Amino acid sequence: MFRKKMLVLALFSIYFLSIEAVRNESFPALLAFGDSMVDTGNNNYLLTLMKGNYWPYGWNFDSKIPTGRFGNGRVFSDVVGIILKSSLQCFFVISAEGLGIKRIVPAYRKLYIAPSDLKTGVSFASGGAGVDPVTSKLLRVLSPADQVKDFKGYKRKLKGVVGRSKAKKIVANSVILVSEGNNDIGITYAIHDAGMRLMTPKVYTSKLVGWNKKFIKDLYDHGARKFAVMGVIPLGCLPMSRLIFGGFFVWCNFLANTISEDYNKKLKSGIKSWRGASDFRGARFVYVDMYNSLMDVINNHRKYGFTHEKNGCCCMLTAIVPCSNPDKYVFYDFAHPSEKAYKTIAKKLVEDIKTGLA
């Protein structure tokens, strides 16, 4: 009787492990492109003022050491990587971390990238980057073209580790997480001298979607196939925007949010049209709704355990001394969500990604 039970258990184990093996093949890696929402430290290796490798950034990160991430801990790409990998582990396993779940997504420009990280994902993103050609030049960060160039270098390294055939398969099945538009709207268009004088918001947002499509097409031409394209966050509700334009009640900036919504609407519509298009044959796309997800947290912050939705925890005139508990703040600094805010919105968004790209 005991032998029968053990045999049945062994068969079930083999069955479920085989299912998990197939599922793990679905998304072998996470490759992140774009801006500071998904930059894990590439700007550390650039001559730019756009850096997050100093105190108080990284306060809640491992060993409390700043890594170049713009926040108190993990950024959105890290959190997505954790959830994707966790959800793909066999449910028999108690200690997921002991199995080597990807707890962080390393920056591609790090001086050393372990072969295991090449196989499971890196970030090519650069804080301050944008698809408008002016944005990255203005802030001296990695442009979309620079990130595509790094992507090509990554592919060469990956081939050296796993071989040409497997490298091609990994790239084609990886989640390609793209975050663009935030700096284009929030800095280049809204603040840069020429921005609003040259074109209307509606014309500019249409151009942004076109530039984003070109960036994604460049990635597609180099083997990427599964794209999770992030919309912009509610830029009018950033602590910086509230402080400058919010008046006595520190309200959200209506115009900035209207432009953000218009861009997101056009991006979402564009993504629908790209599916099945001849120039994107075999590609899959999913829209990642950052705007409404974060706005829900802002509007219902107490429900999610936050007490501060208007001000950042640090790095502002209203927070020269960092707060004692970043988990109580939706935003860590003047423009970037806290790690807890990312974690709060990520679970639902990752489910959308898995469903849309499966």
UniProtKB/Swiss-Prot annotation:
Entry's Gene Ontology molecular function annotations: lipase activity
Q: Which SUPFAM superfamilies does the record cross-reference, listed alphabetically? A: SGNH hydrolase
**Subcellular location, in the record's words?**
Secreted
Record flagged with keyword Secreted = yes
Kindly name one Pfam family recorded for this protein.
Lipase_GDSL
What tissue specificity is annotated for this entry?
Answer: Flower buds.
Could you give a single Gene Ontology term from the biological process aspect? lipid catabolic process
UniProt enzyme class: hydrolase
Tagged with keyword Ribosomal protein: no
**Where do glycans attach?**
24
Signal sequence extent? 1-21
Homology family: Belongs to the 'GDSL' lipolytic enzyme family.
Q: What name goes with this protein?
A: GDSL esterase/lipase EXL5
Give the organism the record lists.
Arabidopsis thaliana (Mouse-ear cress)
Q: Which gene encodes it?
A: EXL5
